[in-house]
C-alpha cells in the first residue's frame, strides 16, 4: 500500500514537471507556435524533462554552418533555424544546426538535417543542393526516399503526426 501511494505521488510529480515544461516551451517559443502550430502543439505534448529546444540561431551562425558544409540551405530551413537552433526530442526527432553534416550515399551528396526515427534509431533527414525537398534515409535498408516537398510539410504533417502518435 505504501508503495502504491509513493508511486502515485511520483507519477503526479512527473506530470506536474511535464506540464511546467510544456507551459515554459509555449511561453518561450511563441514564434514557433505561430509558424508551425501543429508541430509545436504535438511537440509540447511529448516534451520530456531531458528534451532540448535551443534558442534561435543568428543569421551569422546559419551562414557559418552553410560555409562549413559548402551547402546553401533551403529558405524554409533557414527560417526554422532563425526560430530555434535545434530541437532534440527523446521520441526520435533531432534537428540541430550544429549537428548538420554532409554525407554521400550511393554517389549522391546530401546534407544531413537531422534524425527521425520513423523506422529505426538513427534514420536521417536529408537535403539536396538546390531543392526544398526533404529526403529520408532508412539506414537499415540503405535506401533514400523523398519524404516531403519542403520543411513545412515535414514539420506540420509528418513530424506532427509522428509526435501525436507517441
Language-model region placement:
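A surface-exposed partner-binding patch
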Residues: 1-131, 166
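Compact, glycine/acidic-enriched structural inserts
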Residues: 137-164
Amino acid at each position: 500500500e505504501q508503495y502504491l501511494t509513493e508511486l502515485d505521488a511520483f507519477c503526479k510529480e512527473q506530470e506536474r514537471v511535464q506540464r511546467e515544461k510544456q507551459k515554459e516551451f509555449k511561453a518561450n517559443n511563441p514564434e514557433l507556435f505561430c509558424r508551425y502550430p501543429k508541430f509545436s502543439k504535438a511537440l509540447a505534448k511529448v516534451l520530456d524533462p531531458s528534451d532540448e529546444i535551443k534558442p534561435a540561431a543568428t543569421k551569422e551562425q546559419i551562414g557559418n554552418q552553410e560555409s562549413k558544409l559548402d551547402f546553401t540551405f533551403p529558405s524554409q530551413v533557414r527560417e526554422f533555424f532563425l526560430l530555434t537552433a535545434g530541437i532534440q526530442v527523446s521520441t526520435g526527432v533531432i534537428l540541430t544546426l550544429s549537428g548538420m553534416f554532409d554525407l554521400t550515399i550511393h554517389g549522391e551528396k546530401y546534407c544531413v538535417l537531422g534524425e527521425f526515427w520513423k523506422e529505426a534509431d538513427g534514420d536521417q533527414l536529408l537535403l539536396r543542393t538546390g531543392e526544398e525537398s526533404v529526403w529520408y534515409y532508412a539506414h537499415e535498408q540503405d535506401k533514400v526516399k523523398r519524404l516531403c516537398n519542403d520543411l513545412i510539410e515535414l514539420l506540420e504533417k509528418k513530424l506532427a503526426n509522428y509526435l501525436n502518435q507517441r
